[in-house]
């Protein structure tokens, strides 16, 4: 009888603990905050614009009006879903289609985004593609590139880091072509 009573008390204590802690843990996991960033929004725009110029020199941009309109339409819907506290009205979200067969997409600071043809072809539905695009848009909205640089060093290093990202994307594109 004593064991049953102790077992019940432990069960009640465990349940009380779970009832109190689980909601707190859930909130902590779903609460998104803007990372620390010493750079101005204009820095993101400048870096992204410079990187976009390089991307468009090195990647084959696909001139398919229907496919481009499609990713622009999906992208525009995703951008309107960005929570107000993370919206930067000066960001220019632009969506271009890269003629590469690998399943990939990437976004640059300030809004330029590139979706590979292979991702559209591999997606079983619009939701799969939109999920990848939303992930990339979140990097832009939360200003991850300059926030990461705030942790690591100078703006010049940031431009170098974007060069490395683009180099990796080029290699991935060659591997998937």
How should these model regions be labeled?
Residues 14, 26-177:
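A Zn2+-metalloprotease active-site environment signal
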Residues 1-8:
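N-terminal secretory signal peptides that target proteins for export/translocation
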Residues 13-23:
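Bacterial N-terminal signal peptides
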């Amino acid at each position: 009888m004593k064991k049953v009573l102790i077992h019940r008390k432990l069960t009640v204590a465990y349940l009380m603990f779970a009832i109190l802690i689980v909601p707190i843990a859930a909130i902590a996991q779903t609460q998104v905050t803007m990372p620390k960033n010493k750079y101005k929004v204009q820095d993101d725009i400048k870096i992204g614009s410079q990187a976009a110029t390089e991307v468009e020199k090195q990647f084959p941009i696909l001139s398919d009006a229907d496919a481009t309109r499609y990713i622009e339409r999906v992208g525009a819907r995703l951008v309107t879903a960005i929570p107000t506290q993370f919206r930067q009205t000066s960001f220019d979200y632009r969506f271009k289609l890269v003629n590469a067969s690998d399943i990939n997409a990437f976004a640059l600071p300030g809004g330029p985004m590139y979706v590979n043809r292979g991702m559209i072809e591999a997606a079983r539905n619009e939701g799969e593609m939109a999920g990848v695009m939303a992930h990339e848009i979140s990097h832009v909205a939360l200003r991850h590139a300059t926030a990461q640089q705030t942790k690591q060093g100078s703006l010049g290093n940031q431009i170098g880091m974007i060069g490395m990202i683009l180099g990796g994307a080029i290699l991935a594109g060659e591997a998937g072509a």
